[in-house]
Amino acid sequence: MDENINELISDLKTHLEYLKGMGIVSLPASGMKADEPGQSTMITLEDVRKELGDCKRCKLHRGRKTIVFGEGNERATLMLIGEGPGYDEDVQGRPFVGKAGQLLTKILQSINLPREEVYIANIIKCRPPQNRNPEPDEIQSCTPFLMKQISVIQPKIICALGAFSAQTLLKTDVKITALRGKFYDLEGIKVIPTYHPAFLLRNPERKREVWEDMKKIAELLNNA
């Protein structure tokens, strides 16, 4: 019995952390009716963008040119999440527009998904210096806005591009080689990690594995 209670408490803590990440800090009291879908209190991506504003919540704002919020279909069934903006993305203010982005577009085309039909974002929205990995305080500042984006879009599948994205979303330090190709649960949304397109540019022999992962995504979307 104690073991079951401890497991329940652990699950509740995980769920509350997820809600906090989405910016939800309170829940309706007993007997009060929660907001119904479609009511005016439902937020949009534009609401999230306005809340983000000219963000200076962490030190990354000092060196950025633009905030890379994300782009795509607000009702996408597939959401792709990378690590952070690179040089080209920082200049243009759009995610995945460099060589890695061009490869990502081709990968999506391979499963008959136009880029315009998906939503693409990153764990963080400002380019880190020298494209280094984001630091914990930077992730903490940016993650609530990503979680709100996920909450608005409600995709059926999230494809985590690269080790950093997968490990951040799944809260694990397991290597991408072990994570990729499998589906995990994030509050009812299927998450499948795969290699980052930039990694594929350096290691083209791994493209076959990404192709296998994308086929799993296509199959799940087609059967939804």
Predicted regions and their residues:
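Short, small/acidic-rich helices and loops at N termini and domain boundaries
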Residues: 1-9
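A polyanion-binding, active-site-adjacent surface
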Residues: 10, 14-21, 25-224
